[in-house]
């Protein structure tokens, strides 16, 4: 489990990215880079790092499922992920 402060920070960053997304898009399209530079740093989507939705773990993130490899494995073994089964060849 990730620290609660890190998970909270990630949620704040996501909210900022969503809040400034439209403004950022228009400023980029119009080439107004001075105004773009004055926006908060955390409003840039490239500063976001993917985190597991269940545990907040930042490493081993599986984009297709939105969770870390560890939680994915646990849930797959329990049969709680529809359409996922253990490979056999």
Swiss-Prot record:
Organism domain of life: Bacteria
Database matches in InterPro entries: Ribosomal_uS14, Ribosomal_uS14_bac/plastid, Ribosomal_uS14_CS, Ribosomal_uS14_sf
Disulfide bonds: none
Keyword Ribonucleoprotein: yes
Keyword rRNA-binding in annotation: yes
GO biological process, one term: translation
Subunit description: Part of the 30S ribosomal subunit. Contacts proteins S3 and S10.
Family: Belongs to the universal ribosomal protein uS14 family.
The protein's name: Small ribosomal subunit protein uS14A
Organism of this sequence: Listeria monocytogenes serovar 1/2a (strain ATCC BAA-679 / EGD-e)
Gene (UniProt): rpsN
